[in-house]
Design a protein with these regions (language model features):
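Phosphate-binding P-loop
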Residues: 1-3, 67
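Short hydrophobic/aromatic beta-strand immediately N-terminal to the Walker A/P-loop
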Residues: 6-8
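Conserved GTP-binding G-domain of TRAFAC-class P-loop NTPases and closely related GTPase folds
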Residues: 10, 15, 108-159
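Conserved substrate/cofactor phosphate-moiety recognition/catalytic segment
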Residues: 19-72
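Acidic, metal-coordinating catalytic cores used for nucleic-acid/nucleotide bond scission
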Residues: 76-89
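Conserved phosphate-donor/acceptor-positioning beta-strand/loop module used by diverse small-molecule
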Residues: 97-111
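Acidic/His-rich, divalent-metal-binding segments that scaffold phosphate/diphosphate chemistry
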Residues: 149-225
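Divalent metal-dependent catalytic cores for phosphoryl transfer on phosphate-bearing substrates
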Residues: 190-289
Length: 289
């Protein structure tokens, strides 16, 4: 007997979630496709009407649970960018469900470009806001399997080179004497010297890869300053890193590396095993100056 499967999709607008879902279901007809857009159309007569998110996802979760309880497999097609977003459906799944999370990924610029050609466009500002909320899915959420789906024509070597080159800019911040790239390289060297696990080393090498994308001289009050700010760079960096590696642990570390600085509740509640990993990356980050 096989367990019913929930494939939870995760990705920003334009990443290709619905295209992936339709293609997958055409080859796996034992799956039910539930999408937040289709639920909006059902509730409000038009998927372009955002409506009440609570109403939309309550109905979507209800349909998913009914299908799983009936023994059907489900593709759950929504952005699911944060742990809170994902917790709604994960917590409601029957205990026998095999939960798989597929991150449907594409470079940020590709997603923004695709969005401009869609009938229902959300715009760059909305995509940027969603990127700054991204929390890398991880196994402590109750997920059994996590995969990254990259575009078929994607060249990872070229992308890696572009990201590294983008990091070769000054921090313009008193907390850092080195530029972004050399800070990350020194973090990596420190991890090697300390003989930390490969995931720590890999995360150290590109933990600040989101900084060039978010760099701003405007503070949270909207005031211009001489100091550069990098708000939510760990979130954007985690999305970027999905194109650099398939190592889920590495990307989760990048996504979480600011948690000790911010004293997040999530970080404080981590198991000793996971907290040690985050603390080791934090050590590399702090001492690489």
């Amino acid at each position: 007997m096989t367990r019913p499967v929930l494939i939870l999709l995760c990705g920003i607008p334009g990443s290709g979630k619905t295209t992936w879902a339709k293609n997958y279901i055409s080859k796996n007809q034992d799956f039910v496709h539930l999408s937040s857009d289709a639920i909006r159309a059902e509730l409000y007569g038009d998927e372009n009407i955002q409506g009440n998110p609570v109403e939309v996802f309550t109905l979507m979760q209800k349909k998913a649970v009914e299908s799983l309880n009936a023994g059907h497999n489900v593709v759950y097609d929504a952005t699911s960018m944060t742990r809170k977003d994902r917790a709604g459906i994960i917590s409601m799944c029957p205990k026998f469900t095999h939960i798989q999370c597929n991150i449907i990924w594409a470079p940020i610029e590709t997603c923004i470009e695709r969005d401009t050609t869609r009938e229902r466009t959300v715009g760059k500002e909305v995509i940027d806001r969603m990127l700054k909320r991204f929390q890398m899915p991880y196994y402590d959420e109750g997920i059994d399997e996590i995969s990254i789906v990259q575009p078929g024509n994607f060249n990872r070597d070229t992308y890696f080179e572009c990201i590294i080159n983008a990091m070769k800019i000054p921090h313009d911040n008193p907390h850092h004497q080195l530029d972004i790239y050399n800070h990350c390289r020194e973090s990596f060297n420190y991890a090697v010297e300390k003989n930390f696990d490969w995931e720590i080393r890999e995360a150290a090498y590109c933990h600040d890869c989101g900084k060039p994308y978010v760099k701003t001289f405007v503070n949270t009050k909207g005031e211009f300053s001489d100091t550069a700010h990098y708000y939510q760079h760990q979130c954007v960096g985690a999305w970027i890193a999905c194109g650099l590696t398939f190592n889920i642990h590495t990307i989760w570390l990048i996504s979480t590396h600011m948690a000790p600085f911010l004293n997040e509740k999530y970080y404080k509640n981590l198991s000793p095993y996971l907290k040690t990993m985050v603390d080791q990356l934090h050590e590399c980050d702090v001492l690489a100056h």
